[in-house]
């Protein structure tokens, strides 16, 4: 398997993880020793479905990279992966940790937030996009997948 195909596979898996993360619980607020869930939010609700847009762009960039678009699609995938990691770490992670900032903490003394599966999906998806972009950039300006360079 050449670098471009490996990069494409990683990128498509990453895009799928990002789409799944948007519809999966990113955090839930529980109260009391019985762990009663007072509120929960999906990844999309928490950051405005931004990662759906990233996933679409990742697929488009992957297709461009497979067609031999040079290093630019790979570098753009690295940037998209970095954006995903910033959203996960700067937007979603604090919401999974800060019980004192929760509206429920005013009404319930023992309210606390905990991370859902979406945070992990976002982190893995972001790392995979960075890796895919690096591989695609390393593959660089060779012949597109499925075509052989002209001999002569």
Which stretches of residues belong to each language-model region?
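Compact integral membrane and secretory-pathway proteins
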Residues: 1-152
């Amino acid at each position: 398997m050449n670098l471009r195909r490996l990069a494409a596979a990683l990128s498509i898996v990453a895009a799928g993880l990002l789409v799944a993360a948007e519809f999966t619980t990113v955090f839930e607020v529980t109260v009391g020793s019985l762990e009663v869930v007072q509120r929960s939010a999906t990844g999309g609700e928490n950051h405005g479905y931004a990662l759906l847009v990233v996933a679409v762009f990742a697929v488009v960039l992957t297709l461009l990279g497979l067609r031999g678009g040079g290093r630019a699609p790979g570098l753009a995938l690295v940037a998209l992966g970095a954006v995903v990691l910033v959203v996960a770490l700067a937007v979603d992670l604090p919401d999974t940790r800060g019980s004192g900032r929760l509206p429920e903490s005013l009404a319930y003394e023992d309210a606390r937030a905990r991370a859902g599966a979406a945070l992990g999906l976002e982190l893995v998806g972001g790392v995979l996009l960075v890796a895919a972009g690096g591989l695609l950039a390393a593959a660089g300006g060779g012949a597109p997948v499925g075509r052989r360079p002209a001999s002569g």
